[in-house]
């Protein structure tokens, strides 16, 4: 069986470590202890890495389409590698959750997230596994755009590193058990 773990974000160094790039950060954390090197594939508009875990080929994906067009890369890669939607997990930021909280879902609307809107539009379904990482709402007069494209406050940095470790543990648990439902029950709502 082949699986695909996708972290959403925006390409380019100016977006490194921004809240909107928590998906990229999570994928980078997951592969940190594996033998994975990313290569940019311009045909698929993504950085792609892979490894074998428990005898299964796992693709780690960071779309380079910019957030709002993430569905283009996701659909192309699922089709090319003949991966079922049920064997894919999308990791992304969520404004409506407190900073550092993680939530697992097997289906649902985009909730205003343009990357998820794009994936739903290109796949034609809302039924795919996902891990949402809370980035909180902007304070005061800050716009949503400035908030999601901003970096985490110093106070939140250690919490985010711990959260990324939890996402890593959860994805590894999923890859061991091959059971997203069980993973949800074990890790949902952690902070």
UniProtKB/Swiss-Prot annotation:
It holds the Pfam family Pept_tRNA_hydro. TRNA binds at residues 15, 66, 68, 114. GO terms for molecular function: peptidyl-tRNA hydrolase activity; tRNA binding. It is found in: Cytoplasm. InterPro entries: Pept_tRNA_hydro, Pept_tRNA_hydro_CS, Pept_tRNA_hydro_sf. The record marks 10 as: Discriminates between blocked and unblocked aminoacyl-tRNA. The active site is at residue 20. Keywords: Cytoplasm, Hydrolase, RNA-binding, tRNA-binding. The keyword Hydrolase applies. It comes from the Bacteria. The record marks 93 as: Stabilizes the basic form of H active site to accept a proton. One of its GO terms (biological process) is rescue of stalled ribosome. It catalyses: an N-acyl-L-alpha-aminoacyl-tRNA + H2O = an N-acyl-L-amino acid + a tRNA + H(+). Disulfide bonds: none annotated. CDD domains: PTH (cd00462). One of its GO terms (cellular component) is cytoplasm. Belongs to the PTH family. HAMAP family: Pept_tRNA_hydro_bact. Hydrolyzes ribosome-free peptidyl-tRNAs (with 1 or more amino acids incorporated), which drop off the ribosome during protein synthesis, or as a result of ribosome stalling. This is Peptidyl-tRNA hydrolase.
């Amino acid at each position: 069986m082949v699986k695909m773990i996708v972290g959403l974000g925006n390409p380019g160094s100016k977006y490194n470590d921004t809240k909107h790039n928590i998906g990229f950060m999570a994928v980078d954390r997951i592969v940190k202890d594996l033998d994975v090197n990313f290569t940019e594939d311009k045909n698929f508009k993504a950085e792609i890495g892979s490894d074998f875990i428990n005898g299964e080929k796992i693709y780690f994906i960071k779309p380079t389409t910019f957030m709002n067009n993430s569905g283009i890369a996701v659909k192309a890669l699922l089709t090319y590698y003949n991966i079922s939607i049920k064997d894919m997990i999308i990791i992304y930021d969520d404004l409506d959750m407190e900073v550092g909280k993680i939530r697992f879902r097997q289906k649902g609307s985009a909730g205003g997230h343009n990357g998820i809107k794009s994936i739903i539009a290109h796949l034609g379904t809302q039924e795919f596994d996902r891990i949402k990482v809370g980035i909180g709402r902007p304070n005061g007069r800050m716009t949503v755009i400035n908030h999601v494209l901003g970096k985490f406050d110093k106070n939140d940095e250690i919490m985010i590193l711990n959260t990324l470790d939890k996402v890593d543990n959860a994805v590894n648990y999923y890859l061991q058990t091959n059971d997203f439902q069980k993973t949800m029950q074990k890790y949902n709502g952690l902070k």
